[in-house]
């Protein structure tokens, strides 16, 4: 699979789009994507940063130059990370690839040409939701659940799970981005230094920070300046963050990264645009009485409903899966697409059918909506598909298939056919075979299923696809495995 990524950035305007696409590209590289090429109109700083990560970069003068180069390399997938994708450009790119994906594009006139639109922050109102636009056949991901974080944050989070937290705030990190135009760094630092308490303070300065003289004068005025460390050009922000009890920043990626690690934050606005984007949500979840500063919002990481970064594998699947359709008859096809919010009521009805949940290990009664929705929102390292049966000119939803434990080398597959009058029609077998093709394509070598010993229909399904009973699972359960 060949993927083209179009992105721009600069030290002056920010590197957020570049860093996000690099994080995404590094994730995709793990999943058997054999060629990733970047296209940018940006300067040498951006090109150097991309090349440092081991990716080829083609410098383009304008959008017409990008189109010419895209036409030459013939990518399977094109990913564009840009706040303002023009309709004509989207239409022209659409004709040059099999799959088109947009990040951070709120423009509906161009989004209609995309297969996938991911707006984790822009236009999301910080609400996690996913829906499928039937008219334009576009899958939309909204909310912080679909942020692609750098791999270092996933590694550090694992380390932090086994550590006990300080009961009081001792170590504070201040980080206000590349330029900090409002000089919040000095304002916050002075307020902290003026307090009676002694904090260990780590200050991260961006490459365009313009107030170093003021910062140096500030440090000279306070005897506690020996408790302050200044950092520039940080390569691993997660490592620096993990040893802090509080992070003071502006709304944006640093805020989400801190909350992902479970570190509380104080959020201060640089400008009115940030206030407009974030104020309604931050007002709801902030705890002003815990804020050590006069302004801003205190956000306790343990009391947010953001599910930051948990949708990573849903994004990976949406980009890499080209095995979502299988012809099973003269006029019929099995199609799988990711489950969206619009499918949840039907999925709950299926999961609440005693003919189905009697083969679940834990569930013993019909679900309540709160239980079902909580399960849906908290899923991690997992992808769920709705199974669609297309016959003649009609399409109907008939079941679901999922794969979990994608963060291991042996993911688990589950299947249910919700319309029981279709049992025995091999719809489940065809659907699982599509999932197995996708897993093999992105580099997995094996997969498994957990099956209750009295679920004869499911046992036959998985055995027909080459699964073998390998070991005992939980009570009355066996594990079946297959090599891909």
From Swiss-Prot:
InterPro entries: Acyl_CoA_acyltransferase (IPR016181), Glyco_trans_28_C (IPR007235), GNAT_dom (IPR000182), PseG (IPR020023). Residues 334-484 form the N-acetyltransferase domain. It comes from the Archaea. GO terms for molecular function: acyltransferase activity, transferring groups other than amino-acyl groups; hexosyltransferase activity. PANTHER family: GNAT-FAMILY ACETYLTRANSFERASE, SPERMIDINE N(1)-ACETYLTRANSFERASE. This is Uncharacterized protein MJ1062. It comes from Methanocaldococcus jannaschii (strain ATCC 43067 / DSM 2661 / JAL-1 / JCM 10045 / NBRC 100440). The lineage of its organism: Archaea, Methanobacteriati, Methanobacteriota, Methanomada group, Methanococci.
């Amino acid at each position: 699979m060949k993927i083209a990524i179009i992105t721009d950035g600069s030290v002056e305007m920010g590197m957020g789009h570049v860093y996000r696409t690099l994080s995404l590209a590094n994730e995709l590289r793990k999943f058997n994507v054999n060629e990733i090429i970047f296209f940018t109109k940006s300067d040498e700083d951006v090109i150097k940063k991309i090349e440092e990560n081991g990716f080829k970069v083609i410098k383009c003068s304008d959008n017409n130059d990008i189109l010419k180069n895209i036409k030459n390399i013939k990518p399977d997938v094109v990913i564009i990370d840009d706040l303002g994708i023009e309709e004509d450009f989207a239409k022209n790119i659409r004709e040059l690839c099999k799959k088109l994906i947009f990040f951070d594009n709120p423009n509906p006139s161009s989004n209609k040409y995309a297969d996938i639109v991911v707006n984790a922050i822009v236009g999301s109102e910080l609400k996690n939701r996913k829906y499928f636009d039937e008219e334009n056949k576009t899958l939309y991901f909204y909310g912080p659940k679909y942020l692609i974080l750098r791999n270092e944050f996933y590694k550090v989070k694992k380390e932090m799970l086994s550590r006990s937290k300080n009961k009081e705030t001792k170590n504070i990190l201040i980080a206000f981005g590349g330029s900090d135009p409002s000089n919040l760094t000095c304002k916050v630092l002075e307020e902290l230094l003026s307090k009676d308490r002694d904090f260990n303070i780590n200050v991260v300065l961006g490459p365009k920070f313009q107030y170093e003289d003021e910062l140096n004068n500030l440090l000279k005025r306070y005897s506690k300046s020996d408790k302050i460390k200044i950092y520039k050009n940080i390569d691993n922000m997660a490592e620096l963050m993990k040893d802090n009890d509080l992070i003071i920043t502006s709304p944006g990626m640093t805020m989400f990264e801190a909350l992902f690690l479970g570190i509380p934050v104080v959020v201060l606005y640089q400008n009115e645009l940030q206030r407009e984007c974030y104020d309604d949500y931050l007002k709801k979840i902030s705890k002003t009485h815990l804020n050590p500063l006069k302004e801003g919002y205190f956000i306790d990481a343990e009391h947010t409903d953001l599910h930051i970064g948990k949708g990573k594998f849903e994004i990976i699947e949406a980009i890499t899966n080209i095995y979502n359709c299988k012809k099973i008859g003269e006029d019929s096809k099995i199609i799988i697409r990711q489950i969206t919010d619009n499918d949840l009521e039907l999925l709950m009805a299926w999961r609440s059918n005693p003919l189905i949940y009697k083969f679940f290990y834990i569930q013993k009664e019909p679900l309540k909506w709160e239980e079902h929705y909580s399960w849906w929102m908290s899923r991690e390292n997992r992808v769920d598909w709705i199974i669609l049966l297309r016959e003649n000119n009609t399409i109907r939803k008939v079941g679901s298939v999922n794969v979990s434990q994608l963060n291991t080398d042996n993911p688990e597959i589950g299947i249910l056919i919700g319309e029981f009058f279709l049992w025995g029609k091999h719809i489940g077998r065809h659907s699982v075979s599509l999932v197995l093709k996708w897993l093999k394509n992105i580099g997995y070598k094996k997969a498994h299923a957990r099956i209750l010993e009295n679920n004869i229909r499911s046992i036959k399904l998985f055995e027909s696809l080459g699964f073998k009973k390998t070991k005992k699972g939980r009570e009355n359960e066996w594990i079946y495995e297959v090599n891909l």
